[in-house]
Regions:
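Short strand->helix junction
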Residues: 71, 110-111
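Conserved short loop/turn motifs at secondary-structure junctions
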Residues: 104-105, 122, 293
Length: 330
C-alpha cells in the first residue's frame, strides 16, 4: 500500500464523518496521484511554493510598509490563520490538510496596501474582490497561465472565506472564523505595541471574556468555537461568542483600521493604486506582455491583475518611476 493510500485510510478511520476526505477531492483537470501526498497536501505545497505566496511577505496587513521587524504582514497573517485553523480542525476531527491549504491560499489575491488597495481597484474597475482574485491566481495566472490545478474544495474555501459567503465544507467554514480570530487578535497586538490603543480601552465585555493579551483572546475564541461546533453540521460560536467577536471587530475598526493616525497613509496607498491603474490604461504598451496575454488582450483586466500582484514597496517605487521627476547628473 502506498503512503498516500495509508493516509487516506487513516482519514476514514480517524476523522469525523462530516469531514472532507482527500480521496474524494476533485480537480478540474485530473492528474496522476502522488505516491506520498494526498490531494490536499499537494494543494498546500503548490500554494506554498508559488510566486504569489512569496509576495505576501511584503504586502500590508494593516500598517503600510512598516519599518519595524515585528509587525504583521500578509504572510505572517496567513501563517497565523493556518495555525489557528489546524488547531481547531484537529479538535473537531476535521481535515487539517484541507484547512491548511485553504488558509495558505485565502489571501493570495490581496493588493498592495491591504484593503485600501482593494478598495482603490474597486473604485476604478467597478468590481474587485480579493477572494475572487485569489481564485483567479490559482486558476489562471500562476504557472504562466496554467494555474495550480487545485482541488475544488480548496478553491471553494478560498472563495468563500469572507463576508456573508458560505463554504461548502466544514473546513472552509472553519477558515472563515480562523481568519477573523487571527486578524482581530494580531492587529490588536500590533496596535497596542504601536501605542495606538491600550488594553484598558477595550470594551468591558471583550476584556472580561477574552482577556487583554493576544494569547488569551485567541484561546477564548478557539475554545468557544470548538465547544459549540463539536459534532455539529455547522461551524459556529454560541450567541455570546458571536456578539463579542462583533463587538471586538467594531472596536478595532473604530480605534485602529479607520483611526486618524492611519488615514494619511491610507489615502496615499489608495492614490498610488488609482494612479498606477490610470497610468497603465493610458500607456498599455508598458504593461508586461505576459500580463496582457493572460488577460487575453483585456487591458483593464491586465492592469488589475498586474497591480493587485504588486508588493507595497514595488508599487511605491513604480509610482515614483511613472510620476516623479528624475534627477540628472549634469
Amino acid at each position: 500500500m502506498l503512503i498516500r493510500e495509508r493516509t487516506e485510510e487513516l482519514e476514514k478511520k480517524l476523522l469525523s464523518p462530516k469531514a472532507a476526505f482527500s480521496a474524494d477531492a476533485k480537480r478540474s483537470r485530473e492528474e496522476t496521484e502522488d505516491p506520498m501526498r494526498t490531494k490536499f497536501q499537494r494543494d498546500r505545497d503548490r500554494i506554498l511554493h508559488s510566486n504569489s505566496f512569496r509576495r505576501l511577505k511584503h504586502k500590508t496587513q494593516v500598517y503600510i510598509a512598516p519599518e519595524g521587524d515585528h509587525y504583521r504582514t500578509r504572510m505572517t497573517h496567513t501563517l497565523e490563520v493556518a495555525q489557528i485553523g489546524r488547531t481547531m480542525a484537529r479538535a473537531l476531527r476535521l481535515n487539517e490538510d484541507l484547512v491548511e491549504a485553504i488558509a495558505m491560499g485565502h489571501d493570495l489575491g490581496h493588493t498592495p496596501f491591504g484593503h485600501v488597495g482593494e478598495q482603490a481597484l474597486r473604485d476604478v474597475c467597478g468590481h474587485f474582490e480579493h477572494n475572487e482574485q485569489s481564485v483567479r491566481i490559482v486558476e489562471c495566472l500562476e504557472n504562466d497561465g496554467r494555474g495550480l490545478n487545485l482541488t475544488e474544495e480548496v478553491k471553494d474555501g478560498m472563495l468563500n472565506h469572507s463576508g456573508n459567503l458560505k463554504a461548502h465544507t466544514l473546513e472552509g467554514g472553519l477558515i472563515k472564523y480562523a481568519d477573523r480570530i487571527a486578524y482581530l487578535c494580531h492587529d490588536y497586538d500590533d496596535a497596542e505595541n504601536m501605542g495606538l490603543i491600550s488594553a484598558k480601552e477595550l470594551p468591558d465585555r471583550v476584556r472580561r471574556v477574552l482577556g487583554t493579551t493576544h494569547s488569551s483572546m485567541i484561546t477564548a475564541m478557539v475554545q468557544n468555537l470548538v465547544e459549540n461546533s463539536m459534532d455539529e453540521d455547522t461551524i459556529h460560536m454560541d450567541k455570546e461568542g458571536d456578539e463579542i467577536l462583533l463587538e471586538f471587530r467594531s472596536f478595532m475598526f473604530d480605534r485602529v483600521y479607520m483611526s486618524q493616525p492611519l488615514i494619511p497613509d491610507r489615502k496615499r496607498g489608495h492614490g498610488v493604486v488609482v494612479m498606477l491603474y490610470e497610468w497603465y490604461m493610458n500607456h498599455p504598451d508598458e504593461l508586461p506582455e505576459k500580463q496582457k496575454k493572460l488577460a487575453q488582450g483585456n487591458i483593464s483586466l491586465a492592469a488589475r491583475d498586474y497591480i493587485s500582484g504588486l508588493t507595497d514597496n514595488f508599487a511605491i517605487n513604480l509610482f515614483k518611476e511613472k510620476y516623479m521627476p528624475k534627477y540628472w547628473n549634469l
